[in-house]
Design a protein with these regions (language model features):
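Bacterial N-terminal signal peptides
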Residues: 14-32
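Conserved functional acidic sites
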Residues: 39-306
């Protein structure tokens, strides 16, 4: 489960700890105070989502209330994760740039992500998202560079339409509890098999920035990580505010909380754009078979929105 989809670990719930909600999930009950937990859906799960490029008429206007991607928005999440058997400090900085990139005929918004472990850059990433006319936010792939001791060691890129990779839904337009899980993308060449499922709604959680009511929790799983779930907490109009986990198979046990939420000034946005373009230049050199098959990103003011 990719780090960019960060949420934040549970610390405060409205009327009950998370384990109570988990125990009640199979019954489909609504707890006091309006807290709703998932129930088993009879609808079949799709291996892949039904992608139709004609449904992305205003693809770069990503205004899904749970997953808004407004140009210049920056989230900073802090917490910890497990690395080589010990807990280490973790900081994630996610920025919506003013770049777009056309992938398989759909213009996507480019996110620039920096992942720090113990104060050192562990990964830098470009991620690509678009919204369809039903409000679903789709992931069209990513280009991550992973580092060790300051040197890039690998870049497991995947892009929709290349190497049997397929775009997936990161956030439904209207999340509902009684729906099956959905593919968040399929990329067998880099073992990307993530799926999401609406787990709980109407929750309350508190992070260093503030407390949030009516929080949506999405549980994410992967074929590569059985018996492991990453829990992403979303607040309306903000996006991801917390990341937690559950399951005996969860190895990283990543915990993150939103500590900063801001809108960049023009100068800072220009610096983010330059950094993203520098990473893209590297991508064309490193990932010639995947990223090299894509068209260059464009500055949004000069790009035609689709």
């Amino acid at each position: 489960m990719m780090t960019v989809k960060c949420g934040l670990r549970h610390r405060a719930f409205g009327i009950a700890p998370i384990f109570v909600s988990i125990l009640l999930a199979s019954s489909g009950l609504v707890l006091p105070g309006g807290v709703a937990v998932a129930q088993k859906s009879d609808a079949p799960e799709k291996e892949f989502e039904d992608f139709d490029r004609t449904k992305f008429e205003r693809s770069t206007t990503i205004d899904n209330e749970w997953f808004p991607l407004k140009v210049g928005t920056r989230w900073v999440h802090r917490g910890s994760t497990t690395e080589r058997g010990k807990r280490v400090a973790h900081r994630l900085v996610t920025t919506v740039t003013d770049l777009t990139k056309v992938i398989d005929g759909v213009r996507t918004v480019v996110l620039w992500v920096e992942d720090y472990k113990e104060g050192k850059l562990d990964e830098a990433e470009l991620a690509f998202f678009a919204q369809d006319k039903d409000g679903n936010v789709w992931s069209f792939g990513e280009y991550p560079e992973e580092y060790f001791n300051g040197r890039m060691i690998r870049a497991p890129a995947w892009i929709h339409g290349l190497n049997d990779s397929t775009a997936g839904i990161m956030m439904p337009g209207v999340p509902r509890l009684d729906t099956p899980s959905y593919s968040q993308g399929w990329a067998p060449s880099v073992f990307w098999t993530d799926r999401g499922k609406v787990d709980q709604m109407g929750q309350k959680t508190c992070v260093p920035l503030r407390c949030y009511d009516d929080v949506l929790i999405v549980a994410e799983t992967s074929k590569a990580e059985p018996n492991a779930e990453q829990l992403k907490y979303y607040a309306r109009g903000i996006g991801k505010v917390r990341v937690g986990w559950r399951g005996e198979g969860e190895k990283l046990q990543e915990v993150l909380e939103l500590t900063e939420f801001s809108q960049l000034a023009p100068e800072a946005l220009a610096r983010a754009r330059a950094a993203a373009l520098k990473l893209e230049k590297s991508a064309y050199n490193v990932s010639k078979d995947v990223y090299g098959a894509t068209t260059p990103s464009e500055h949004m003011p000069s790009a035609q929105h689709r």
